């Protein structure tokens, strides 16, 4: 079993975090290639307006994707805790419970988004010259929510057992497939933005199926028996208690980004295209923070399950050092050469769009350290079993992002739009650090006594 699971309760915390984070980072980057491939190929072969159409739905895609990722990660926190405690039967029941809940909620999300998508696009002031393509694109993505759910649930289960490499391998395969499908559907069949959406959904579905095949073939520990499906109300309740706040936290963030997108849409399709290109660059560079957060959720869950609180402290410290170091490198890169990646996305109005891309990348680069703090501490705290506290940080992000977005909309300011996310990161990061110190210095001592005296 050593090849398919990883015990994070022993060994060097820094080494463990690095070895676990790197495959997740690569996997997340390849997952971003789904959307980046769409944007690059659409922008190059269809045009700037088509790129703006895809980009104008980016915040809605983040709402969908974020809800799915947050929920499935939350459902499997209990899986990691049971695994860390050595309760294998309980662990399998949490897997069954997560599967049932994910299917039902995924079905509900699919119907809801498809029913209300057109009013939502109107509410966001989507420019009329890109509305039709934007609507077709996001409707196809909404129809593929269960495909997203399948991959993210199974990859979260594998990560709960300490396996972050297998999801990466399947993501690489599906990312390459997505690019091939993009080229065929957009260039050969001239399907435009809808073709890009179809390619994305198909590739995501295949990555999920590959994860399922691997689990059935290689991991007997996850082969569910009839009795494992007798989940029980207590497991469902705990999974919903952790999973829904994590999903809602992403949703709160997405609502804030939708406010930013609405303010941006007022400025016209050219700036929407520029912001889209800049956001794609940002998303690739910042996937390291998402990976660190995912690692800390698993690390925290396994170690709290094992009752090893001093090791939890060590892990937070190690990951914070890692996050700060990466931030310095990433900020230097994105603020100096990031703008030249604009050439990947557009062939027309390049000078205007590149200038706008550069403004955005420089605005966010100064605030990468707060972004690292947000991801590490939010997910780490959730891994310890605290679902509601990090959601308060999500509210802080919404307030920071929303206030700046409203001002930007009123002033019709592109710079204001660019500063909305940094404002959210600073507010949420400060709040999460305060929460962490409260949990470790007050609540954990009540639970475990003077744990500092333990090994």
Task: Please give the residue ranges for each predicted region.
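Short alpha-helical transmembrane segments in multi-pass integral membrane proteins
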Residues: 1-21, 79-144, 188-244, 300-367, ...
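N-terminal transmembrane alpha-helices
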Residues: 8-45, 59-74, 78, 103-110, ...
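Small-residue-rich hydrophobic transmembrane alpha-helices
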Residues: 51-111, 148-167, 274-338, 371-393
């Amino acid at each position: 079993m050593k090849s398919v699971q990883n015990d994070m309760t022993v060994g060097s915390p820094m080494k463990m975090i690095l070895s676990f984070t790197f495959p997740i980072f690569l996997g997340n980057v390849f997952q971003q290639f789904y959307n980046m491939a769409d944007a690059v190929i659409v922008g190059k072969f269809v045009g700037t307006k088509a790129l703006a159409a895809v980009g104008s739905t980016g915040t809605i895609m983040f709402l969908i994707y974020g809800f799915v990722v947050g929920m499935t990660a939350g459902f499997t926190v209990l899986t990691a805790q049971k695994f860390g405690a050595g309760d294998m039967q309980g662990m399998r029941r949490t897997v069954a419970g997560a599967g049932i809940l994910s299917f039902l909620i995924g079905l509900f999300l699919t119907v809801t988004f498809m029913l209300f998508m057109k009013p939502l696009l109107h509410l966001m002031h989507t420019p009329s010259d890109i509305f039709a393509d934007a609507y077709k694109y996001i409707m196809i993505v909404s129809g593929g929510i269960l495909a997203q759910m399948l991959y993210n649930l199974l990859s979260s289960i594998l990560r709960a057992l300490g396996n972050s490499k297998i999801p990466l391998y399947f993501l690489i395969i599906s990312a390459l497939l997505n690019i091939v499908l993009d080229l065929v559907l957009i260039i050969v069949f001239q399907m435009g933005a809808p073709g890009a959406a179809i390619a994305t959904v198909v590739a995501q579905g295949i990555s999920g199926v590959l994860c399922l095949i691997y689990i059935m073939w290689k991991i007997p520990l996850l082969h569910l028996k009839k009795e494992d499906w007798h989940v029980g109300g207590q497991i469902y309740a705990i999974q919903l208690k952790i999973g829904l706040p994590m999903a809602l936290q992403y949703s709160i963030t997405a609502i804030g980004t939708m406010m930013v997108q609405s303010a941006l849409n007022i400025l016209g399709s050219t700036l929407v295209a520029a912001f889209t290109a800049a956001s794609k660059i940002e998303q690739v560079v910042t996937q390291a923070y998402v990976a660190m957060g995912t690692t800390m959720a698993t690390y925290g869950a396994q170690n709290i399950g094992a009752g090893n609180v001093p090791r939890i402290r060590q892990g937070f410290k190690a990951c914070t050092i890692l996050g700060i170091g990466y931030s310095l490198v990433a900020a230097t890169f994105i603020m100096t050469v990031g703008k030249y990646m604009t050439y990947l996305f557009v062939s027309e109005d390049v000078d205007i769009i590149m200038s706008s891309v550069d403004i955005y990348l420089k605005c966010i680069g100064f605030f990468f350290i707060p972004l690292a703090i947000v991801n590490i501490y939010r997910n780490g705290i959730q891994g310890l079993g605290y679902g509601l506290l990090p959601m308060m940080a999500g509210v802080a992000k919404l307030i920071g992002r929303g206030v700046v977005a409203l001002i930007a909309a009123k002033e019709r300011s592109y710079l204001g739009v660019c500063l909305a996310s940094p404002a959210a990161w600073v507010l949420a990061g400060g709040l999460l650090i305060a929460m962490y110190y409260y949990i470790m210095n007050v609540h954990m001592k009540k639970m475990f006594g003077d744990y500092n005296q333990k090994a």
